[in-house]
């Protein structure tokens, strides 16, 4: 009974699917997918519930959202454990994800008031009022890398604005989604306000193409995001918010504390086994003795990164990738780069057959003439040596993506020069580029998104503005327009 439609748990009527722990192949979830007919029922349920949900008013909606926050707080250990088992991420990391889900509530409320809400100004003839209204029924497509936090960042602001939701999580992390919906149910959410449809491509296509949804919020691959963008191109009445990852650059220039630089590089490239959309994929290091020394330190540190199962003790820095298929894909990506002329500095290896466990890789691609502009979604960092700062920035910008970028540099002047020229939605200085503030927008340009930044700006795509000029009574103006006689 793993579909949640119209406030009731029901079995899927499609084909059987399982979710496995990628670190040990243990089956942790088993069910059947939602059929297109069940997706249709879910959308109908959301449509039928939407106006009443909106008319409850903000304070009543907020009370239910805050009850959900309380449920998350009470069940954060279970949430962290389920995320760890299903994604393979170590427990220390999934505990931070569960905490981020709780913190998202307060941030979303603040964003609602600051970015949307209601404002009023007096005018000579009455008053001008700005309000925001929900789009209606929105679809939320969740990713596997942050299966709780990222869909939560769409769902919470959507509900606060008065929308209802049909949630289609990644087929790789269905158990996390199921737990989320159980907590919403305990929070007293009215029937139909959130509907959960579990499934694979067929389920996703049925939801994305449904004529009765008013918007779709997507986090995932650039390939799928571009398909959705093309699909929605002729339908301007529907809001589409896309976050699609990046081929993110990190430049090192004139850093005295090389140990700190190595730490920030590792946190940028290898956290979450490289499965964050903001992870550094390309590292630009100056040619010369200083750059050589930095890379020697980095190679030693990368070799020393501890990799293990989600529950290993002592806890590893890197857990499993999401699947054995993903792990094999990273080995193949490394092989392709070597065939193009790259030189491994630390070889990425598949540690155990049947699992997603890989060791982190570091590879020098300076001699690759045409470096593929690909997001290799795993722990493989490509090194490019440079001799000129302008050259490094030009190479950093040589991507169709534009999500995150960063520079480690002791000089503020170097940072300002970089900031003015780099093309990315998240630009950090002397901090890991996987670090982003929840009180700021999150999104990129180019193939990384469609100018619908999430996080603090998610409120913007969850509602549309309604501008009104109002007066308490109909009245004649003090002076009629020329040519009128009443």
Curated annotation (Swiss-Prot):
Enzyme Commission identifier(s): 1.2.1.71
UniProt GO BP: arginine catabolic process to glutamate; arginine catabolic process to succinate
Keyword NAD on entry: yes
Record's keyword terms, sorted: Arginine metabolism, NAD, Oxidoreductase
NCBIfam families for the chain: arg_catab_astD, PRK09457.1
Pfam families for this protein: Aldedh
Protein name (record): N-succinylglutamate 5-semialdehyde dehydrogenase
UniProt similarity note: Belongs to the aldehyde dehydrogenase family. AstD subfamily.
Pathway: Amino-acid degradation; L-arginine degradation via AST pathway; L-glutamate and succinate from L-arginine: step 4/5
Annotated binding of NAD(+), by residue: 220-225
Function statement: Catalyzes the NAD-dependent reduction of succinylglutamate semialdehyde into succinylglutamate.
Molecular function terms from GO: succinylglutamate-semialdehyde dehydrogenase activity
Reactions catalysed, as given in the entry: N-succinyl-L-glutamate 5-semialdehyde + NAD(+) + H2O = N-succinyl-L-glutamate + NADH + 2 H(+)
HAMAP family xrefs: Aldedh_AstD
């Amino acid at each position: 009974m793993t579909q949640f439609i119209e406030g009731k748990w029901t079995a899927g009527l499609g084909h059987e699917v399982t979710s496995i722990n990628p670190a040990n192949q243990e089956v942790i979830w088993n069910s059947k997918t939602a059929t297109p007919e069940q997706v249709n029922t879910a959308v109908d349920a959301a449509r039928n519930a939407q106006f009443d949900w909106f008319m409850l008013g903000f304070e009543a909606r907020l009370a239910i959202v805050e009850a959900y926050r309380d449920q998350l707080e009470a069940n954060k250990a279970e949430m962290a454990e389920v995320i760890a088992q299903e994604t393979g991420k170590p427990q220390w990391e999934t505990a931070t994800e569960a905490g981020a889900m709780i913190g998202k509530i307060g941030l979303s409320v603040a964003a609602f008031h600051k970015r949307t809400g209601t404002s009023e100004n007096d005018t000579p003839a009455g008053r001008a009022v700005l309000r925001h209204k929900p789009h209606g029924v929105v679809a939320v497509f969740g990713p596997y890398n942050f299966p709780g936090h990222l869909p939560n960042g769409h769902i919470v602001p959507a509900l606060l604005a008065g929308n209802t939701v049909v949630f289609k999580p990644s087929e790789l992390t269905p158990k996390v989604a199921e737990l989320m919906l159980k907590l919403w149910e305990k929070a007293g959410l009215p029937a139909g306000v959130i509907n959960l449809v579990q499934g694979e491509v067929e389920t996703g296509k049925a939801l994305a193409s449904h004529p009765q949804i008013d918007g779709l919020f997507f986090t995932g691959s650039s390939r799928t995001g571009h398909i959705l963008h093309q699909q929605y191109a002729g339908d301007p009445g529907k809001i589409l918010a896309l976050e699609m990852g990046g081929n993110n650059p990190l430049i090192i220039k004139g850093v005295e504390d090389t140990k700190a630089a190595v730490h920030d590089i590792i946190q940028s490239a290898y956290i979450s086994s490289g499965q964050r959309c903001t992870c550094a994929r390309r590292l630009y290091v100056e040619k010369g003795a200083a750059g050589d020394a930095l890379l020697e330190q980095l190679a030693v540190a990368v070799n020393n990164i501890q990799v293990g199962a989600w529950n290993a003790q002592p806890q590893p820095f890197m857990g499993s990738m999401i699947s054995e298929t993903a792990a094999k894909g990273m080995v193949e990506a490394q092989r392709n780069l070597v065939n193009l002329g790259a030189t491994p500095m630390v070889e990425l290896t598949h540690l155990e057959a049947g699992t997603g466990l890989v060791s982190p890789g570091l590879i020098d691609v300076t001699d690759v003439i045409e470096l593929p502009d690909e997001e290799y979604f795993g722990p493989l960092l490509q090194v490019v040596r440079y001799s000129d700062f302008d050259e490094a920035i030009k190479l950093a910008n040589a991507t169709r993506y534009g999500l995150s970028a960063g520079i480690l540099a002791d000089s503020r002047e170097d940072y300002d020069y970089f900031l003015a020229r780099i093309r990315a939605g998240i630009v950090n200085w002397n901090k890991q580029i996987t670090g982003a503030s929840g009180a700021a927008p999150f999104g990129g340009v180019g193939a990384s998104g469609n100018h619908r930044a999430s996080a603090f700006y998610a409120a913007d795509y969850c509602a549309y503005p309604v501008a009104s000029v109002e007066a308490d009574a109909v009245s004649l103006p003090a002076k009629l327009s020329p040519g009128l006689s009443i």
